[in-house]
C-alpha cells in the first residue's frame, strides 16, 4: 500500500522558503529568485526510512491572495486541513521578524484552524551564522542572528514536534529535515486512521448493546407472559379442584339420602310385617 505524505511550508515571504524546496527537490542550489514553489507540475519525491517507502508532496503556502498581493490579514494559510499531513514552519535565522511571526502569526492560525496537524519548526540560512561564511570575513555582528537555543525555546513554546536548522546554499541538513517530516506526517495519518477505527468500534459496541437490550426486553416480556399463563393455568386447576370437591360433596349428600331412603324402606317393610 502506497504511503503518501503532504507537506505544507509556511512562513514569512522572501525568507528563502521556495529556494529551500527547490534545492531539496532538484538537489541543486540556484541563485535564481523564485516567486513561489509550484508543486502542481512536480512529481512526489520518494524517501526510504527503515525499509518503508514514503512519497512526499511538497506544497508552499505563498501568502499571496488571488490578485497577487501579499496578505496582511488572516487567514494566511490557503489549504484545507484534509490536504495537509504536516506543517513545515520556516524562519530565517537572520530575520528576527520572521522568527517572532512564527509565534504571533503562523502558530496562532495553525492552532486556530489546524489543531490536529503537527508542526516542525526550522531555521534556514544557517550559513550566514557560520563565521567562515561571513562575507569576505568582515566584522559582522553575530548577535542579531537567531541562536539554536532560541529556536529550541520557540519550538517548545508553540508545541512543535522539534526544531531543526538547515542551509540551502550548503545543502546542509535538508535530507534529515525531510526524513523527519515524512515520519511525522505519516504518523499523523496512522493516528487519524486509528481514531476512525475506534469511532467505528464504539458505534458497533453501542449497536450491540442496544440489540442485546432489545433481546433482553423481549425475553423478559416472554417470561412475564409465560408466568401469567402459568398463573391462569393454576387458577383454572384450582377451579377444577373446587368443582371436583363440590361434586364429591354432592355425591356424599346423595349417598346419605340413599341411605336414609333405604332405612325408611326397611322400616316400612318391618311395620308391614308386624301388621300382618
Swiss-Prot record:
Entry keyword annotation includes Lipoprotein: yes
GO cellular component, one term: cytoplasmic vesicle
Name listed for the protein in its UniProt record: Rho-related protein racO
Membrane topology note: Lipid-anchor
Binding site for GTP: 11-18, 60-64, 124-127
Organism domain of life: Eukaryota
Protein family: Belongs to the small GTPase superfamily. Rho family.
Residue numbers spanned by region Disordered: 199-276
One GO process term, biological-process aspect: cortical cytoskeleton organization
Keyword Cell membrane: yes
Lipidation (S-geranylgeranyl cysteine): 273
Motif Effector region per UniProt: ranges: 34-42
Propeptide intervals in chain numbering: 274-276
Alphabetical list of PROSITE patterns matching this protein: RHO
Pfam families (UniProt xref): Ras
Places the protein is found: Cell membrane
UniProt biased composition (Low complexity): 200-270
A single MF term (Gene Ontology): protein kinase binding
Positions bearing Cysteine methyl ester: 273
Record's keyword terms, sorted: Cell membrane, GTP-binding, Lipoprotein, Membrane, Methylation, Nucleotide-binding, Prenylation
Broad class of where this protein is predominantly found: membrane
Amino acid at each position: 500500500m502506497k504511503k503518501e505524505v503532504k507537506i505544507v511550508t509556511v512562513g514569512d515571504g522572501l525568507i528563502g522558503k521556495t529556494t529551500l524546496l527547490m534545492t531539496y527537490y532538484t538537489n541543486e542550489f540556484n541563485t535564481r529568485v523564485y516567486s513561489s514553489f509550484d508543486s502542481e507540475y512536480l512529481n512526489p519525491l520518494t524517501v526510504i526510512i527503515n525499509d518503508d517507502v514514503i512519497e512526499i508532496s511538497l506544497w508552499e503556502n505563498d501568502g499571496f491572495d488571488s490578485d497577487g498581493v501579499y496578505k496582511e490579514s488572516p487567514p494566511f494559510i490557503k489549504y484545507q486541513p484534509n490536504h495537509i499531513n504536516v506543517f513545515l514552519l520556516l524562519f530565517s535565522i537572520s530575520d528576527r521578524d520572521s522568527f517572532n511571526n512564527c509565534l504571533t502569526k503562523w502558530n496562532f492560525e495553525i492552532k486556530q484552524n489546524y489543531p490536529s496537524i503537527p508542526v516542525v519548526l526550522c531555521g534556514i540560512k544557517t550559513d550566514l551564522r557560520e563565521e567562515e561564511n561571513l562575507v569576505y570575513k568582515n566584522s559582522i555582528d553575530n548577535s542579531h542572528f537567531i541562536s539554536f537555543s532560541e529556536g529550541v525555546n520557540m519550538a517548545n513554546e508553540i508545541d512543535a514536534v522539534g526544531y531543526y536548522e538547515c542551509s540551502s546554499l550548503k545543502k546542509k541538513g535538508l535530507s534529515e529535515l525531510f526524513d523527519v517530516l515524512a515520519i511525522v506526517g505519516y504518523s499523523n495519518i496512522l493516528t487519524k486512521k486509528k481514531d476512525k477505527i475506534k469511532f467505528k468500534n464504539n458505534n458497533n459496541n453501542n449497536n450491540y448493546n442496544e440489540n442485546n437490550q432489545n433481546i433482553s426486553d423481549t425475553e423478559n416480556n416472554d417470561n412475564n407472559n409465560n408466568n401469567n399463563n402459568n398463573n391462569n393455568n393454576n387458577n383454572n386447576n384450582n377451579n377444577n379442584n373446587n368443582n371436583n370437591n363440590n361434586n364429591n360433596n354432592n355425591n356424599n349428600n346423595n349417598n346419605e339420602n340413599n341411605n336414609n331412603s333405604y332405612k325408611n324402606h326397611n322400616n316400612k317393610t318391618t311395620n308391614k310385617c308386624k301388621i300382618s
